[in-house]
A protein has these predicted regions:
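N-terminal prosegments of processed precursors
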Residues: 21-130, 254-258, 381
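Divalent metal-coordination and catalytic microenvironments
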Residues: 92, 217, 277, 330, ...
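N-terminal signal peptide c-region/cleavage motif recognized by signal peptidases
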Residues: 16-18
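Short, solvent-exposed loop/turn and secondary-structure capping segments
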Residues: 126-127, 287-292, 341
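Bacterial N-terminal signal peptides that target proteins for export
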Residues: 1-8
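Fold-level signature of zinc-dependent metallopeptidase catalytic domains
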Residues: 21-42, 135-303, 316-319
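The catalytic-center signature of Zn2+-dependent metalloproteases
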Residues: 232-255, 301-374, 378
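Active-site-proximal beta-strand/loop segments in catalytic clefts of secreted hydrolases
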Residues: 94, 106-107, 116-118, 127, ...
Length: 382
């Protein structure tokens, strides 16, 4: 892989998330029936310092689920800063299914997250943060998430149409020397940043919102790339008028990425990490003014003091925001877009996570995994 590739290469993922209900719909979803969480207080009284393993059981989609969960220590440092310590990230698997992985955040007794059962990805979404707009916690297959044609496209071209394809696309692009399992053998520290616009949307829950998204990203990367995501730092800027504030009022995605890179370069608490990722509440746009852009990142930029940066919009729901972030972090890891002319993965035609348009897949293609494996092998911070 070229040693200078990261200097100028960046890639943008785009889709219209400003009015998510208009761009994503579900052909089927169900509430969680007979939900029980044992080993932790469902009223949120369990504290981070004493959090232990839990079992989560429920019925849905014609089957019974038994989730075996342990606190996700990679994210607990960030979680300790949350008010009341009632937000706990968990990782684990389905009982008796070693090819599965689970990432769940339990906030005030309410679960949300992702389940990979060995063949398909399932999303659990809480009231107020689910695609269906339901007033209860729901579960659905990502394959049942329908994306409006043309609403999720990238400047590099291409469009995809369902949620299952987004995961498949991501995994296909990351997937060679890795196994579908809950564990990971290496790790990378990712510094998380939120701008004032993100804080304006999520308010006091901004850190919780970032934590939930990164817990899902960790599931994807741990299982498919063999690299776990550690989060030693979450910085939430709440006032754009208070100095020092690193971002201008620009909504141009490339310009905002440059500002993030400058901030990372000059901030020791960020550049000590392998990567920095910004969640923005802005409706960012491309150089041509296309506001369907939702993410951008430097490609092949692991461990780079300035260029180890990427950003994604945090204006949608947790599941799809996490897929966007995973896509952009995939670029940081060296994965180009699948099926794009003159790309190293130009011949990849499936619906995978690194397709130029969000499609509901969380799977990296084999080509993506091969490309990332090269960068991982050379990365000093992994």
């Amino acid at each position: 892989m070229s040693g200078v590739r990261w200097l100028a290469a960046w890639a943008a993922l785009s889709f219209s998330m400003a009015v998510q209900a208009a761009t994503i719909s579900l052909s089927h979803h169900e509430p969680l029936q007979r939900l029980s969480i044992s080993g932790a207080s469902v009223d949120g009284s369990q504290k981070i310092g004493v959090a232990g393993p839990v079992e989560m059981n429920f019925d849905a989609l014609g089957r019974s689920f038994e989730l075996q969960l342990s606190p996700n220590g990679r994210l607990l440092d960030a979680a300790r800063d949350l008010a009341g310590n009632s937000v706990i990230p968990y990782r684990g698997k389905l009982a008796g299914n070693d090819s599965s992985w689970v990432r769940i955040v339990i906030a005030d007794g309410v679960p949300s997250g992702l389940i990979w059962d060995g063949s398909e990805l399932l999303a659990i979404e809480r009231p107020g943060d689910n695609v269906a707009g339901a007033d209860s916690t729901i579960i659905y297959r990502l394959a049942d998430a329908i994306i409006a044609p043309g609403s999720m496209s990238c400047g590099a071209g291409g469009s995809l149409s369902n949620g299952g394809a987004v995961y498949k696309s991501l995994v296909s692009e990351l997937n060679a020397a890795t196994a579908q399992a809950e564990g990971a053998v290496t790790q990378i520290d990712v510094g998380a940043v939120a701008d004032a616009e993100f804080a304006g949307i999520h308010g006091a829950n901004s850190q919780q919102a970032i934590l939930a998204r990164l817990n899902n990203v960790d599931g994807i990367f741990s299982a498919q790339v063999g690299v776990q995501i550690n989060v030693p730092l979450v910085q939430v800027f709440t006032d754009s008028g208070a100095a020092p504030y690193p971002f201008s009022g620009t909504v141009n995605a490339g310009n905002l990425l440059d500002e993030l890179a400058d901030y990372r370069n000059g901030e020791p608490n960020q550049n000590v990490n392998g990567l920095t990722h910004l969640w923005t509440g802005k409706d960012v746009e491309s150089d041509t003014g296309n506001n369907s852009t939702v993410g951008i990142a430097f490609t092949g930029a692991l461990c780079r003091q300035r260029f180890g940066a990427g950003l994604s919009e945090g204006r949608g729901n947790t599941t799809f925001d996490a897929l966007v972030a995973a896509h952009e972090i995939g670029h940081n890891f060296g994965a180009p877009h699948d099926g794009t002319s003159n790309s190293a993965c130009e011949s990849e035609t499936g619906d995978f996570l690194m397709a130029p348009s969000l499609n509901g897949s969380d799977q990296f293609s084999q080509c993506s995994l091969d490309q990332m494996a090269d960068d991982i092998a050379q990365a000093s911070c992994i």
